[in-house]
């Protein structure tokens, strides 16, 4: 351990020297803008206080980006799973197109990404934090001049890091603080004469939730009721109930509060409350991180010449619909927080809310557009939201989007999901029409918590047929896999099978 600590300190000291050597004036230049892209893991759309739905959770630094920029309340993941979503953010493609369809598949090195395109157009680029495409691969990836990451998920304390393919070493401390230190030092080392872009990949708020020491008791006096949908499963597909005692169900072993159904015992409620509190606590540290990077940009005179993006790969179900997971097409799973600060989009004293649907696949075309680079053909499933963020009308903007998830043998608790989400209605279907895989229809305006499945309502038959047909047409246009692929082998065990990762 002393060897690793010495190496870790050497790495951090060397970064500090680079940062000092690259100090610059506080004058913002007129060149292409820098990019700071902060990506959290499993953070729900309502887990930032600017959403108005965060309860006692306050995120003033994240909110500030929206209050001085653009807030997108209707941002969505095309696949609510870590690796596929991260690949979609980089490539502007759905998972079946870029090939990363689970959490153990390597990202294809020959696929264009927005960092690679920026690098090819003169940007200096960096990735710091959780990359999570390739379970045990921490080698540098194409498109990044500087690459600091680790294998797999990393851990909240004392993660083993690898910088630019060098020797692995534990950097002692809390993950969110360390990743911010690394990002801060790299940013301070950049020249004011050359544009740069950095992605900052947080572990938080991914489970298991281990908060920073200073926040470990926050929210302890907050009572948190079970979500209204936790026990309202009668009109849902059978697989909802089948997964209750599994790794991704509220009575499974993941958070160790398996009781009778429904469980309203004091022990069960306390365990649920503490899970949600700890989830929020990890986000407090992320908010601190955003504040640090904001002030760094101020100090080096690059705040107003930087596109500062904050988002997540997808959301998470914290007990809703009886689930502790993402993957599904529920709002808590597919909606993401998204705020963007850049005066080239809107002045800091004239913030804007853009209600249109934007997707993870829109990041790649949007960022290259803002950088003044020609559109990239490979970013084929997304659209630039630059004009929307600037307040321009877009009559032809999407009014619906397709959500896709593909069954995983490693985590066999969710079937293939194909869904069409419109502004008001959502239609979800599974591989077949047995009770186990019963389809779903929700009125998001009257029933935002998706409590009442309207699929069997006679008055909704025409709507179901219409949305079913639209989903078919969109899936064909995307070149997506058939509903029955990959083959669904069903729920075979309550714990994931590590042997087939």
List the model feature ranges, each with a label.
Residues 20-439, 448-469, 473-476, 483-485, ...:
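Formylglycine-dependent sulfatase
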Residues 445:
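Residues forming the ATP-binding cleft of Hanks-type serine/threonine protein kinase domains
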Residues 1-9:
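Bacterial N-terminal signal peptides that target proteins for export
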Residues 8-19:
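Bacterial N-terminal signal peptides
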């Amino acid at each position: 351990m002393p060897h690793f600590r010495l190496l870790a300190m050497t790495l951090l000291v060397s970064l500090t020297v680079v940062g000092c050597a690259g100090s610059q004036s506080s004058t913002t230049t007129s060149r292409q803008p820098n990019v700071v892209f902060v990506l959290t893991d499993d953070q729900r759309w309502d887990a930032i206080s600017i959403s108005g739905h965060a309860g006692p959770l306050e995120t003033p630094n994240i909110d500030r980006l929206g209050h001085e920029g653009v807030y997108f309340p209707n941002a969505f993941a095309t696949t609510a799973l870590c690796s596929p979503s991260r690949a979609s953010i980089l490539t502007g493609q759905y998972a079946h197109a870029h090939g990363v369809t689970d959490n153990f598949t390597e990202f294809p090195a020959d696929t264009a990404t927005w960092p690679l395109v920026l690098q090819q157009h003169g940007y200096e680029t960096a990735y710091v934090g959780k990359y999570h495409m390739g379970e045990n691969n921490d080698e540098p990836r194409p498109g990044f001049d500087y690459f600091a990451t680790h294998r797999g998920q990393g851990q909240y304390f004392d993660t083993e890091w690898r910088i630019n393919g060098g020797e692995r070493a534990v950097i002692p401390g809390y993950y969110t603080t360390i990743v911010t230190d690394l990002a801060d030092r790299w940013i301070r080392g950049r020249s004011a004469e050359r544009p740069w872009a950095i992605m900052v990949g947080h572990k938080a708020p991914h489970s298991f939730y281990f908060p920073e020491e200073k926040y470990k008791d926050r929210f302890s006096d907050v009572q948190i009721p079970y979500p209204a949908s936790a026990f309202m499963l009668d009109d849902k597909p059978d697989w909802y109930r089948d997964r209750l005692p599994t790794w991704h169900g509220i009575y499974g072993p993941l958070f160790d509060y398996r009781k009778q159904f429904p469980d309203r015992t004091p022990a069960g409620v306390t365990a649920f409350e503490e899970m949600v509190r700890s989830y929020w606590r990890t986000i407090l540290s992320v908010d601190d991180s955003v504040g640090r990077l904001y002030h760094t940009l101020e100090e080096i005179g690059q705040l107003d010449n930087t596109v500062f993006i904050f988002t997540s790969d997808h959301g998470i179900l914290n007990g809703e619909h009886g689930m502790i997971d993402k993957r599904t097409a529920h709002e808590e799973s597919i909606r993401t927080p998204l705020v963007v600060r850049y005066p080239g989009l809107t002045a800091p004293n004239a913030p804007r809310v853009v209600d249109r649907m934007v997707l993870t696949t829109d990041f790649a075309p949007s960022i290259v557009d803002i950088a003044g680079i020609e559109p990239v053909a490979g970013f084929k499933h997304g659209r630039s939201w630059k004009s929307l963020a600037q307040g321009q009308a877009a009559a032809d903007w999407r009014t619906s989007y397709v959500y896709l998830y593909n069954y995983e043998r490693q985590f066999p608790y969710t079937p293939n999901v194909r869904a069409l989400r419109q502004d008001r209605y959502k239609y979800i279907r599974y591989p077949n029409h047995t009770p186990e895989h019963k389809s779903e229809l929700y009125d998001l305006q009257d029933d935002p918590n998706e409590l009442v499945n309207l699929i069997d309502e006679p008055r909704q038959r025409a709507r179901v047929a219409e949305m079913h047909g639209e989903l078919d047409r969109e899936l064909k246009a995307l070149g997506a896999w058939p509903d029955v692929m990959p083959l669904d082998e069903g729920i075979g065990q309550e714990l994931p099978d590590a042997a087939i990762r």
